[in-house]
Structure formats: C-alpha cells, structure tokens
Curated annotation (Swiss-Prot):
It comes from Saccharomyces cerevisiae (strain ATCC 204508 / S288c) (Baker's yeast). Disruption phenotype: Causes increased sensitivity to unfolded protein response (UPR)-inducing agents. Residues 78-119 are annotated as: Disordered. Residues 109-119 have a biased composition (Basic residues). Residues 84-93 have a biased composition (Polar residues). This is Putative uncharacterized protein YMR294W-A.
Length: 119
C-alpha cells in the first residue's frame, strides 16, 4: 500500500514537472519575436511594441516567479500557523510563548506524547 502511494506521488510530481515545462516553453514562445509578427497591425490592434513587451513580460514573471517566498505570502502563512496553534491541545494559547519560561519543562502541547511509550 505504501509503495503504491509513493508511486502515485512520484507520478503526480513528474506530471506537474512536465506541465510546468510546457507552460514555460509556451511563454518563451510568446515572448519570442514570432509572437509580435502574428499580431495584425490593423487600426484596432495598433499597440506599440513596448506595450506588448510589457504584457508578455508580466505574464512570464507571474509564471516563473516563486510566489511561495514572496514576503506577503510568508507573512500570511506564519499568521495562519499561529492562528491554528491557538485552538489545539488543551486550549493552550501556544501563540503566547512569553508566559512559558524554557526552564519549567516541555511545552503543554507535548505533554501527551511521552506517556504512550510506557504503556
């Protein structure tokens, strides 16, 4: 069963890698000069070259930039984590770490784990 799960996970990983490569290749093609020639230069579509470049670049940045490490994303994740911890365990506010001095012992959340070993 474990083997099957890991196999499925590996397949998923490979699939996502392939999709990512497809996307990046697509955007490289979009930015290449052939993309600009495909746009008809009629009066309705008379964008200057610079505007087209900016649009293509923003698309590329959006797809290649690692949003996980964006400062706002990091801040949001840490905020969510602190919110989750506040309701877990014996209703202990684990977000307020200042009340617990490190010399007293293990944190209240870890109390239950050690008793299982002796059963």
């Amino acid at each position: 069963m474990k083997y099957e799960i890991s196999k499925i996970r590996a397949e998923n990983r490979n699939y996502h890698k392939k999709e990512k490569n497809k996307v990046s290749k697509g955007y490289q093609a979009l930015i290449s000069s052939s993309f600009y020639q495909t746009i008809p230069s009629s009066s309705s579509f008379a964008f200057p070259q610079s505007v087209r470049v900016v649009v293509a670049d923003t698309l590329l940045v959006h797809h290649t930039f690692d949003w996980k490490h964006h400062p706002l994303a990091v801040a949001y994740r840490s905020h969510r984590k602190s919110q989750q911890h506040q309701t877990q365990g014996n209703q202990v506010l684990r977000g307020t770490r200042k009340l617990e001095s490190p010399t007293v012992g293990p944190r209240p959340g870890l109390r239950r784990q050690h008793t299982r070993n002796f059963l």
